Amino acid sequence: KNVMLNFLHNNVKIISNPLCNNFTFSKFYQNDFLPGEAKARFIIKKNDLEEFSKNFNQKSNEVFYNTLGFSLDNLLEKKVINKPDLSKIDVDGNELEIIKGARNLLNNANKLTILIEIRHDTKNQISEELTKMGLHKILDFSDNEIWAK
């Protein structure tokens, strides 16, 4: 809806599959269908499933299904998308997996800015990964960080 309201339908590609660190089938969980409150997660590791299940609202209409996930590097290799100059990562917990799945992009980018919503339990790991790939934190506010190269 936002794409149409902002007249971006010729400039935006909607890919409804989840991003992760590789090309894999796994479970996608969602327990809230209010806009901005999806609380959705593509679960790749078993211990992630246990942790995520604790946060599910027991009265919710929890749904899950098996779906294909892929990495940003997969999409770039297959020429599904062009190299971005600006990216936003706001995915309810798979930030680290998405970053790991974008290693080629991040290592080889000359110019790139990323706005990322950070979870406290992965903040240090995300910082280490992005720093190793040559990005520098330029702004830190609330649960969001901006990194650039």
Q: Where are these predicted regions, by residue range?
A:
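Phosphate/nucleotide-binding beta-alpha loop and adjacent structural elements of enzyme active sites
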Residues: 1-149
